[in-house]
């Protein structure tokens, strides 16, 4: 009798445990059944990780071709950041190819018609020229990146075969070397698995997933420090103002009808602290005096600082060459795949160009579960993208190195030579501007321009009277230029593209695959 309560308690605990064991087993079986069901049904054709510019555009393009797309994005709120604020004319063309050009409307974007350059009191404005072979108006757009991203997300989500969900992808699910899907945490904190024959990783410049797929590493080159000056309008709001300041460049541009973005680039190893006010002192004392008084550039630069730097932000500039991922069932795109210095503002354009190519390559395939076929197509994608990616990556890398101010006479000669070349305003400048705007992705033409800039720089250093010292420095310019170019010839697989017949074939192939 005394132990009756103990037996009752034991019986209760045992019943509770058996009940829960049965429940857990049922849930596990149910999960597996649901997964198997999803796989059998082929409920999703493509999973896209990340809905930035690349992920959202790709989702729309693939869904338009009838694919069932599941996009998983970590944060569906409007991104507040200062990258991707100039959509080059070439990027607008790619958006039009994808049926997304209207996403540039109703976001108070500003027309970008020219590049204005400033150095040591001299100034030149270089319009993006009208290239007759380019089927689009040669005008880009200056904008708030977050607004564009939201428009792209809305447009993708408006299609019934796109499921856009907030969630953070934790890992890829792999079976025998083939990626089958992802594990992610949804907004309710539940861990979920999703399966599809193809997963596209578009999780941006801080990508974690990339590391398990490709073995390339990113390099931090410098930092861009930026803030917005509110209630302001530049006297020339349609130019991107690039100041050849020291040690690195400043850039000022209109991003909405009454907001101006001010950016200063700072070396990676000496970035002043934002939190203790060092940064505002640096901007006010070191950078502001170098901003030309032309128009109202300096006034707006200072106004932003004096109004208390509401939201000063810094972003790392990175470079990472593209590497082919040899796993099946997965593709990496956007910044997770390939990055370059943002000095020529072309990352979004390259990502969109990649999407146009990939979409056109995948179009004839009714079933993406043929992973061997998809993997072969990805190999040709990697080659076809070269005219655009190699041209833009090389130009960005060389410009970013040339624009660094140093006390080295040869390097300063090249910096001045670059300014002189751009400021001439002749047919050569126009040619380089069409490359810059993404209207002529032609590596061979770029190499010719780079050779011409080198010769201009050498000529500048030798004039008016060549001396042995000047001659020596001009030879150093040549050596430096060859070294920079040489590195890219190898890295970007440029060599074969420089053979004129190959270059022409590459370009034809590129145009055919980017045009709907
Ligand atoms: C300072 C700076 C200035 C730039 N200026 C320009 C410019 O003017 N013009 C231009 O064309 N390019 C510019 N670029 C480059 C451009 O911003 C990028 O190339 C472009 O934004 C890349 O798009 P993306 O979709 O690959 O990445 P993002 O736009 O970064 O999108 C990645 C998305 O993935 C999501 N995500 C990340 N991890 C996960 C996860 N685990 N699960 C789910 N979602 C995830 C993120 O939330 C994000 O929405 C600039 C770059 C820098 C650094």
From Swiss-Prot:
Biological process annotations from GO: sterol biosynthetic process
Cellular component, GO annotation: endoplasmic reticulum; membrane
Pathway: Terpene metabolism; lanosterol biosynthesis; lanosterol from farnesyl diphosphate: step 2/3
GO MF, one example: flavin adenine dinucleotide binding
Keywords for the protein's UniProt record, in alphabetical order: FAD, Flavoprotein, Membrane, Oxidoreductase, Transmembrane, Transmembrane helix
Membrane protein topology class: Multi-pass membrane protein
This protein's record includes keyword Oxidoreductase: yes
Cofactors required: FAD
Pfam family, one: SE
UniProt-listed InterPro entries: FAD-dep_OxRdtase, FAD/NAD-bd_sf, Squalene_epoxidase, Squalene_monox
Subcellular location: Membrane
Tissue: Expressed mainly in seedlings and inflorescences.
Enzyme class, broadest EC rank: oxidoreductase
Protein family: Belongs to the squalene monooxygenase family.
Protein name: Squalene epoxidase 4
Positions that bind FAD: 53-54, 73-74, 81, 153, 169, 335, 348
Function field: Catalyzes the stereospecific oxidation of squalene to (S)-2,3-epoxysqualene, and is considered to be a rate-limiting enzyme in steroid biosynthesis.
EC code(s) of this entry: 1.14.14.17
Keyword Oxidoreductase: yes
Misc remark: SEQ4 or SEQ5 are unable to complement seq1 mutants.
Chief place where the protein resides: membrane
Protein encoded by which gene: SQE4
Catalysed reactions, as listed in the record: squalene + reduced [NADPH--hemoprotein reductase] + O2 = (S)-2,3-epoxysqualene + oxidized [NADPH--hemoprotein reductase] + H2O + H(+)
Ranges that cross the membrane: 2-22, 43-63, 435-455
């Amino acid at each position: 009798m005394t132990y009756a309560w103990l037996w009752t308690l034991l019986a209760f605990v045992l019943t509770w445990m058996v009940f829960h064991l049965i429940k857990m087993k049922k849930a596990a079986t149910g999960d597996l059944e649901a997964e198997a069901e999803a796989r059998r049904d082929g409920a999703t054709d493509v999973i896209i990780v990340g809905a930035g510019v690349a992920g959202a555009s790709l989702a729309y393009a693939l869904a338009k071709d009838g694919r069932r797309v599941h996009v998983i994005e970590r944060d569906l709120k409007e991104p507040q950041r200062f990258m991707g604020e100039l959509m080059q004319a070439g990027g607008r063309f790619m958006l039009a190819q994808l049926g997304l050009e209207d996403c540039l409307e109703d976001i108070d974007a500003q027309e970008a018609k020219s590049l204005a350059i400033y150095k040591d009191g001299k100034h030149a404005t270089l319009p993006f020229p009208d290239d007759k072979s380019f089927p689009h108006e040669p005008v880009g757009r200056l904008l708030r990146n977050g607004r564009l991203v939201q428009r792209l997300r809305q447009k993708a989500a408006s299609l019934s075969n796109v499921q856009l969900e907030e969630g953070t992808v934790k890992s890829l699910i792999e079976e025998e070397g083939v990626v089958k899907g992802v594990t992610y945490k949804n907004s309710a904190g539940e861990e979920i698995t999703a399966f599809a024959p193809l997963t596209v990783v578009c999780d941006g410049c801080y990508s974690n997933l990339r590391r398990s797929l490709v073995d390339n590493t990113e390099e931090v080159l410098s930092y861009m420090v930026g803030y917005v000056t509110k209630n302001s309008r530049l006297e020339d709001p349609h130019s991107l103002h690039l100041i050849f300041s020291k040690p690195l460049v400043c850039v000022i541009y209109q991003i909405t009808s009454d907001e101006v973005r001010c950016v200063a680039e700072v070396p990676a190893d000496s970035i002043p602290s934002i939190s203790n006010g060092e940064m505002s002192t640096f901007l006010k004392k070191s950078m502001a005096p170098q901003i030309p008084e032309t128009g109202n550039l300096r006034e707006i630069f200072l106004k932003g600082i004096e109004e208390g730097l509401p939201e000063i932000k810094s972003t790392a500039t990175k470079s990472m060459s593209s590497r082919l991922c040899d796993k099946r069932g997965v593709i990496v795109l956007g910044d997770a795949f390939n990055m370059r210095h943002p000095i020529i503002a072309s990352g979004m354009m390259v990502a969109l160009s990649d999407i146009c190519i990939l979409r056109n390559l995948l179009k004839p395939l009714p079933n993406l579960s043929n992973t061997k076929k998809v993997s072969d197509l990805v190999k040709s994608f990697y080659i076809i993208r070269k005219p655009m990616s190699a041209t833009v990556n090389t130009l960005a890398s060389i410009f970013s190195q040339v624009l660094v101010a140093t006390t080295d006479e040869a390097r300063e000669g090249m910096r001045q030579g670059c300014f002189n070349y751009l400021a001439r305003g002749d047919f050569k400048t126009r040619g380089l501007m069409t490359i810059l705007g993404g209207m002529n992705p032609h590596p061979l033409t770029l190499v010719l321009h780079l050779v011409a800039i080198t010769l201009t720089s050498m000529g500048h250093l030798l004039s008016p009277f060549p001396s042995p010292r000047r001659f020596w420095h001009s030879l150093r310019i040549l050596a430096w230029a060859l070294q920079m170019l040489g590195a890219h010839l190898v890295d970007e697989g440029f060599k074969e593209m420089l053979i004129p017949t190959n270059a022409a074939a590459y370009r034809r192939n590129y145009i055919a695959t980017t045009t709907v």
